[in-house]
Amino acid sequence: MVIKKPANKVDKKSTFKSSNKKKNPFKSSFLTKNKDLIYRILFTLLALIIIRLGVYITVPGVTLDKRFATDSSRIQFFQLLSTLGGGSIGRFSILALGVSPYITASIIVQLLSTDVIPVLTRWSKSGERGRKKLDKLTKIIMIPFALMQAEATIFTLSSQGLIIPGWDNTNAIANSAFYYILIPLVMLGGSFFMLWIADQITIKGIGNGISIVIFIGIIISMPSNLKSTFEYWVSNSGEEANIFFSGLLNFMIYISVFLLVILSVVIMNEAERKIPIQQTGSGLTDSSEHTPYLPLKLNNAGVIPVIFASAIISTPITISQIIEAVNPDSGFVIFTRDYLSFNTWWGISIFGILIVLFTFLYSQVQINPEKIAENFQKSGTFIPGIKPGKDTTKYLTGIINRLSVVGSVFLAIIALLPYVISKLTQLPSNLAIGGTGLIICISVAIQTVQQLKGRIIQQNFIEKKKEKFTNNINKNKTSHIW
């Protein structure tokens, strides 16, 4: 009898707890469990809304010509700037430069950090503190590139009559200091603001901020590109039925190939080589399903080689745009037009070669075979049939190089596809299938989804740990209550 009384008390407590659970049905819901994740998603959406609002603020002191939106999209320099800048060049916005100058500066800093300048190499290996120093240096180097791109934009648009100095077609500020000095400074400020927003997304939001900013700019432009493609194939085909249906068929083929290209990019992004590994003393496993492995992606470098190649090839084109406004017959302008323009086979080929080179270089940066081999030795891990140490390094280097060959060629084909199609069919390159923008969009989308999944799994793991800990405490209380 003495023992039963405490048991009744326990039953009352458990009944009380269970009744509480019924009264609070949202206690274990997704929203309450993942408050941090929901906050990050909402913060990212808010940041992107702010950027999209900024796109509609035109640079002060100019009037846009009616032909601006259509004609500016056909200029190669603006196509590259639009891809890397977040797509706001089409409105000559204060955010027109986007994060393009920062990307160009970061390429230079990364290249100089690879044992070229000892101080930068030391910073790159000194953890978070060194990374912050490199980031500050990148932002300083970004300033001249941003001003140069802004000047090139103004010179190019002015020479073609796409922007008119002054408000309401008044020529009050033409050739003045405001036009050639203050407007570039406004665009520089816009670029820094966009970079700050991108940094905030990285810290408080979801995904890599710079990638997300570029991604949203490209995605926003896709519906208008599809509309323009429909008009190119169907609306402008004339009133004759056979020509109309022929144009409609061409558009349907275009959409089908577009979807196939998206599917192929997704497959190539997810494809990986699984290298079986063993732990010293663990013994052999019975089936291949339970064998631990080292995953090496077919495209280890991701979208970075395409972005880097675009930034590199856009730099001489930027300088050329400024020189052309002053001296159209300059040798440098002619060289750029003949050998770096995507309207020529030379320009297309050089762009492809740059993508291949950057894929090989960045694959070695992303996956360091020496570091992996060293970590394997420390943890007692080895690849069956391969000796630890130098042999493992050599083996991994060979596999990474072979994967890079396939990955780099694939990236180059997809990135060059719109320019090749444009060259062969006269379809405007900004409307053609594939391209840098498509690769960036798919890669960023996949990475962001993976990060979301990772955060959800991490949060669920923490919740289970908390629940297990609480249950253990309750059990201890119950066992000692009498």
UniProtKB/Swiss-Prot annotation:
The entry's localization annotation reads: Cell membrane
Segments for region (Disordered): 1-22
Keywords in UniProt for this one?
Cell membrane, Membrane, Protein transport, Translocation, Transmembrane, Transmembrane helix, Transport
Q: Which GO terms describe its biological process?
A: intracellular protein transmembrane transport; protein targeting; protein transport by the Sec complex
Which InterPro entries does the record associate with it? SecY, SecY/SEC61-alpha, SecY_CS, SecY_dom_sf
The UniProt transmembrane annotation reads: 41-61, 92-112, 137-157, 177-197, 201-221, 243-263, 303-323, 342-362, 405-425, 426-446
Task: Kindly list the cysteine pairs connected by disulfide bridges.
Answer: none
How is this protein situated with respect to the membrane? Multi-pass membrane protein
Name a GO CC annotation attached to this entry.
Answer: plasma membrane
Task: Report the main location listed first in the record.
Answer: membrane
Keyword Cytoplasm in record = no
Function statement:
The central subunit of the protein translocation channel SecYEG. Consists of two halves formed by TMs 1-5 and 6-10. These two domains form a lateral gate at the front which open onto the bilayer between TMs 2 and 7, and are clamped together by SecE at the back. The channel is closed by both a pore ring composed of hydrophobic SecY resides and a short helix (helix 2A) on the extracellular side of the membrane which forms a plug. The plug probably moves laterally to allow the channel to open. The ring and the pore may move independently.
Subunit relationships: Component of the Sec protein translocase complex. Heterotrimer consisting of SecY, SecE and SecG subunits. The heterotrimers can form oligomers, although 1 heterotrimer is thought to be able to translocate proteins. Interacts with the ribosome. Interacts with SecDF, and other proteins may be involved. Interacts with SecA.
Q: Which family does it belong to?
A: Belongs to the SecY/SEC61-alpha family.
In its UniProt entry, what is this protein called?
Answer: Protein translocase subunit SecY
* Organism of origin: Mycoplasma capricolum subsp. capricolum (strain California kid / ATCC 27343 / NCTC 10154)
Q: Which gene encodes it?
A: secY
